[in-house]
Amino acid sequence: MKAARFYDRGDIRIEDIPEPEVTPGTVGIKVAWCGICGTDLHEFMEGPIFIPPCGHPHPISGESAPITMGHEFSGVVYAVGEGVDDIEIGQHVVVEPYIVADDVPTGPGDNYHLSKNMNFIGLGGRGGGLSEKIAVKRRWVHPISNKIPLDQAALIEPLSVGHHAYVRSGAKAGDIALVGGAGPIGLLLSAILKAKGLKVIITELSAKRKEKAKESGVADYILDPSEVDVVSEVMKITNGDGVDVAFECSSVNKVLDTLVAAVKPTGVIVIVSIWSHPASINVHSVVMKELDVRGTIAYVNDHEETIKLVEEGKINLEPFITQRI
């Protein structure tokens, strides 16, 4: 079968590789669609990062480059391994693409996403969505309604990143949120916030991203910091109070500074983006306003709720697809 394989920085090859073996406890999936994540681009341009370099196998998967890429994908079940009796052939599914040690608990309340040596299918080994077929442990396979188009279903993985950021924030319906950055994660996070009943303000410079935010309907207000003073506008919108919660989705320090200034006293700031460079923060403001600054990474037991929001029609993923290849 065909697969996109990462060899090294700037070196991804389309190759013929053997089809995966569907072993006991796994599910064979024929891949329908796979998204290209910002992480994939970083691996190509700056990697290997998550991908274990050639000759340095990942401690859990035992694999190193070349690695089959792709972790945002949907597909149709074509085979089930021995012991799998709750998924049928022909079922539409998405994958929560974790690689964790076999002794790591993965039930409700378990923080398996923070476990030692955690990695992702499509980065750390075990196949990937940029291939024709993949075999995945049953635990990580999530059935979805056949009513969800499979191209849209491929976005459930990054949507779950947004859902976990929302959970980490502790926000509730009726709150006002400021999202700093309208890239894919910022937009999908905003879709989650709207579905959960929050008022959403987005700050973004890019004309294309502002247009996508408008087109998708995920923001009540879209502020361009090159045109307006974002903090002043936020204060007008919130009657001088500031927002209840803010989400940093840009890896840009000026955006983080804006969020610190725009959040109300005792408010929450969630750092969603992965920074590849040092950041600074106005600690005096954090202290004097008693702000709560939190990190978030990926997702943990978020997929079921995310899938439910899409199945119930509370989130439409179609506007977030920019191109199909």
What are these regions (language model features)?
Residues 161, 185, 209:
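Hydrophobic/small residue at the entry helix of a nucleotide-binding pocket
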Residues 59-66, 71, 99-180:
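NAD(P)H dinucleotide-binding glycine-rich loop of Rossmann-like/cofactor-binding domains
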Residues 231-232, 236, 274-323:
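C-terminal substrate-binding/catalytic core of Rossmann-like NAD(P)-dependent dehydrogenases/reductases
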Residues 263-264:
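Helix-to-beta-strand junctions that scaffold the AdoMet/dcAdoMet cofactor pocket
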Residues 176-182, 194-258:
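Adenosine-nucleotide cofactor-binding segment
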Residues 267-268:
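Glycine-centered, small-residue-biased loops immediately flanking beta-strands
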Residues 20-34, 49-103, 145-147:
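Glycine-rich beta-strand-centered segment in the early N-terminal region that forms part
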